[in-house]
Amino acid sequence: MTMFNKVSRTFRFGDNDVTLTTGEVARQASGACVVQMGDTVVLATVVAKKEAKEGQDFFPLTVDYVEKAYAAGRFPGGFFKREGRPSEHETLTSRLIDRPIRPLFPKGLPEDVQVLASVISSDQENESDVLSITAASAAVMLSPLPFAEAVAGGRIGRINGQFILNPTVKEMAESDLNIVFAASADALVMVEGEATFVPEDVIIDALEWGRKEIQPLVEAQVKLRELAGKAKMAFTPQEDDAALLARIEELAAGAGLEAAMRVPEKMARKDARKLVKEKIVEALKADPTYGEDEKALSSVGDIIGHIEKKVVRKRILDEGTRIDGRDTKTVRPIEIQPGILPRAHGSALFTRGETQSLCVTTLGSSTDNQRMDSLTGDVTKTFMLHYNFPPFSVGEVKPVRVSRREIGHGALAEKALKPIIPAGDGFPFTVRVVAETLESN
């Protein structure tokens, strides 16, 4: 007799057995699933607050990926010998999990939802990041939360022209391709990767091959849901108020919204749109139908945003011009000024229309490389690209801190440049590039 209602699904996947288990641990979470491949084990949980927040204009989903040092028999670095703030790898993997699952929740879901993927065992061969995508999806599938369909994560490598699904760490060292993707039963839902000058048709073939190969992971989640899933909560998306939408469209036309959307400069257009919104709000307050309706008044911004999208789309289709007046083939004016900083090792100011980036390069010795703790041991980096997006670049006031988005965008640019940066004993240097966004439209 056991106190656990444990349900598992085990199947052969590539060169490994994969097991999905639920009902044994984290039973007070809304949903929990343990996924194991080799000796790498990931526990994913999802919890939704029972008190919903009304009136939010976004889905309050938080996704965190955590690597426990004990998973590889290691001590955390630092004085306190305890896991601290997320590493760059953990932050990037959190974003990797977030992207495929976020669109599968229904629009308008008001509950705060937290997905947590914890690496609790690592064999240092089978990568835990792609397992975490599958584990997170399975946890949500098992929970009462509405969720469109199961997705699974995978990595595609290529050695000697042959694709490999979920290659080991050793195999990845020889691969000229590193694609991380997520797929449902019938479509790709997320792709991220890097390669060493691989032709486009190879990438397309790899993705189609990977989508087919990963289906056992999707099917296993569906089966596990049938065996152990909780009853899904009832959720009816809030329907748009057709009468209010029509009234605001009428007011927007009279307030000059279309003319405001034709202002070519971003900040001037922003001011013009603000004036239009103020006119619409004042008109609604004077309207006997909506004057006392706080919900209607608070939804004006969202509805105007919806109307603006329609206006811009119609203009592109009917006139072939974009929001700033350009046609669909004209590139914004570009100006590049190299050597703009007198004491930096390398610098350039890149301006394209109302978007501007100051890029600065610093060259150091091998002692300047970045040393990082990881489950596979100490890792060093000799090339790094850091991306900063300060609030003044879009004319806003916000706290100054490094966001997940900045870390993600920096990693994306770093992947693009890494293949052309010299490495090895013939180049015993460390290179750091910083991209400072000074303007953005």
Name each region found by the language model.
Residues 2-49, 236-379:
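Extended amphipathic alpha-helical scaffolds
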Residues 4-8, 13-16, 30, 41, ...:
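Alpha/propeptide regions of enzymes that mature by internal proteolysis
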Residues 29-113, 119-126, 185, 192, ...:
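Glycine-rich, flexible beta-strand/loop modules in the N-terminal catalytic cores of phosphate-handling
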Residues 68, 102, 106, 141-145, ...:
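Generic secondary-structure signature for well-ordered alpha-helical cores
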Residues 76, 80-82, 92, 96, ...:
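Small-residue-enriched alpha-helical segments and adjacent helix-cap loops
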Residues 107-113, 148-150, 217-235, 267-268, ...:
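Flexible, glycine/charged-enriched surface loops at secondary-structure junctions
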Residues 124-130, 240-246, 438-441:
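Short glycine/threonine-rich loop-to-helix capping motif typified by GTGT followed
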Residues 144-264:
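Mobile "lid/hinge" segments at catalytic clefts and subdomain interfaces of large enzymes
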